[in-house]
Curated annotation (Swiss-Prot):
Keywords in alphabetical order: Ribonucleoprotein, Ribosomal protein
NCBIfam families: rplM_bact (TIGR01066)
Organism, scientific name: Alkalilimnicola ehrlichii (strain ATCC BAA-1101 / DSM 17681 / MLHE-1)
Taxonomic classification: Bacteria, Pseudomonadati, Pseudomonadota, Gammaproteobacteria, Chromatiales
Protein name: Large ribosomal subunit protein uL13
GO cellular component: cytosolic large ribosomal subunit
Keyword Iron applies: no
Role description: This protein is one of the early assembly proteins of the 50S ribosomal subunit, although it is not seen to bind rRNA by itself. It is important during the early stages of 50S assembly.
Length: 142
């Protein structure tokens, strides 16, 4: 018997909606990354994007443990000397709550062309409403 290898045209992708209200950031992000990669499917193939679409709602209500709300920092460099920008979790969750989940999940995906394709299947919304009702996403309990 030959080893099965999924082909990109044969992959069936489902849509799921996840409520982030009260969930811990890292635990939610690891489960979302796992499903974006498609590792929960029996036809998972490492070199093919077999993952599902994930819609995360209520990103503004995500929780972190301990003092991470004030201590956790997000850094970015503009490319110019001395231009390292830093922002705390508290300020980022007020300014752009979607970015917190996007950055956490992106850090758990492969750092290559396949990882960039996987992150495009993640849709994050600050509030409880999303605009993907036409895809009929199934609720996913994490």
């Amino acid at each position: 018997m030959k080893t099965y290898s999924a082909k990109p045209a044969d992959v069936q992708r489902d849509w799921y909606v996840v409520d982030a209200n009260g969930k811990t950031l890292g635990r939610l992000a690891s489960e979302v990354a796992y499903r974006l990669r498609g590792k929960h499917k029996p036809e998972y193939t490492p070199h093919v994007d077999t993952g599902d679409y994930i819609v995360v709602v209520n990103a503004e209500k995500i929780a972190v443990t301990g003092n991470k709300a004030s201590d956790k920092m997000y850094h970015q460099h503009t490319g110019y000397i001395g231009n390292m920008k830093s922002i705390s979790f508290e300020k980022l969750i007020d300014k752009a709550p979607e970015r917190v989940i996007e950055k956490a999940v992106k850090g758990m995906l492969p750092k290559n062309r396949l990882g960039r394709a996987m992150i495009k299947k993640l849709k994050v919304y600050a509030g409880g409403e999303h605009r993907h009702a036409a895809q009929q996403p199934q609720p996913l309990d994490i």
